Amino acid sequence: MSRIVTYSPAYTIVPTYECFNNCSYCNFRSDPGKSSWLSLSEAEKQLLSLKNKGTIEILTLSGEVHPNSKYRKAWFQLIYKLCQLALSLGFLPHTNVGILTRSEMEELKQVNVSMGLMLEQITPKLLKIVHKNSPSKIPHLRLQQLEWAGELRIPFTTGLLLGIGETVTDWKDTLEAISNIHQKWGHIQEVIIQPYSPGSENKWVSDGFNVNLLPEVIAIANEVLPSNITLQIPPNLVKKPEILLACLENGARDLGGIGPFDEINPDYPHPHYQALIKVLESRGWQLTKRLPVYSKYDDWLPINLKNIVSEWRIKLSIY
């Protein structure tokens, strides 16, 4: 069994925090019109400060502007230009900005090496609880997004959010839905298994997901999902070293994007790199960098992106 655990050295840029969804567990969003938008000049300052400091991936993460909003086009154009900017500075963009149209996904494929969208849970009962004010959390819309990503040959990351009112059966149903779509298109790189962790801004009163159960969920995911999908866990949300290690023993092999700040979970800082290595090495695990696109998908990329990815692979010997 391989004892290699991967992560992506990443930095997150946020076009806007405003979001027309209002998930009761969210620690990220602000109300529409209440959040300023990131300017390209400010984004350039942020990205230039990262040059030659080890960052590979630029994750564009945004609140959602309603599809019918008069600001939707400007929102999308900003996201596109931010990805272009990241590419121009030699970084590799990955975008996760919520529900997109098929044509929007097709456009963003030209400036992203991979994309993502959390499926969270496909049970419709959450639309009466934590997602009752979240129109884009309707399960069939998110499943459609995964289908389109496959049709468009976009390397994709999705995942489950645990502890938001679902059951063990719901976990399995969501994992099986991901498996079925992947077996059709073969495009899903990673599935994130994310425990809900309460923060200072959420409205929902909850103790969060019991992380002691996380190794069990990993084992279930490892059984349900095809072996060519990598299971990812966020180390900043798994504070107990023994739980993190148990998750690895049960099949998790990736720790996601690790950078200065977790925008989605701002109350949970990423672990210090050396401390993480110490925990992993105590059980014979080796932490290694990866790119935000797996090598088996390089040929899916537009030629200009493929060339940039190839330069990174040669530079870091990541194949």
UniProtKB/Swiss-Prot annotation:
Cite the EC number: 4.3.1.32
Could you tell me which InterPro entries the record lists for this protein? Aldolase_TIM, CofG_family, Elp3/MiaA/NifB-like_rSAM, F420, rSAM
Q: Name the keywords, alphabetized.
A: 4Fe-4S, Iron, Iron-sulfur, Lyase, Metal-binding, S-adenosyl-L-methionine
Instruction: Give the record's pathway.
Output: Cofactor biosynthesis; coenzyme F0 biosynthesis
Identify the residues that the record assigns to the Radical SAM core domain, covering every copy.
Answer: 5-236
> Source organism's superkingdom?
Bacteria
Alphabetized GO MF terms: 4 iron, 4 sulfur cluster binding; 7,8-didemethyl-8-hydroxy-5-deazariboflavin synthase activity; iron ion binding; transferase activity, transferring alkyl or aryl (other than methyl) groups
Q: What does the record say about how the cofactor binds?
A: Binds 1 [4Fe-4S] cluster. The cluster is coordinated with 3 cysteines and an exchangeable S-adenosyl-L-methionine.
Binding residues annotated for [4Fe-4S] cluster, in chain numbering: C19, C23, C26
Q: Does the keyword Transmembrane apply?
A: no
The main enzyme category here is lyase
Cofactors: [4Fe-4S] cluster
Q: Which PROSITE patterns would you find in this protein's record? A: RADICAL_SAM (PS51918)
Q: Give yes or no: UniProt keyword Iron.
A: yes
Q: Which reaction does it catalyse?
A: 5-amino-5-(4-hydroxybenzyl)-6-(D-ribitylimino)-5,6-dihydrouracil + S-adenosyl-L-methionine = 7,8-didemethyl-8-hydroxy-5-deazariboflavin + 5'-deoxyadenosine + L-methionine + NH4(+) + H(+)
NCBIfam families linked to this entry: F420_cofG, PRK06245.1
**Family, per entry:** Belongs to the radical SAM superfamily. CofG family.
Assembly with partners or alone: Consists of two subunits, CofG and CofH.
HAMAP family for the chain: FO_synth_sub1
Query: What is known about what this protein does?
Result: Catalyzes the radical-mediated synthesis of 7,8-didemethyl-8-hydroxy-5-deazariboflavin from 5-amino-5-(4-hydroxybenzyl)-6-(D-ribitylimino)-5,6-dihydrouracil.
- What name has this protein been given in UniProt? 7,8-didemethyl-8-hydroxy-5-deazariboflavin synthase
Q: Organism, per UniProt?
A: Trichodesmium erythraeum (strain IMS101)
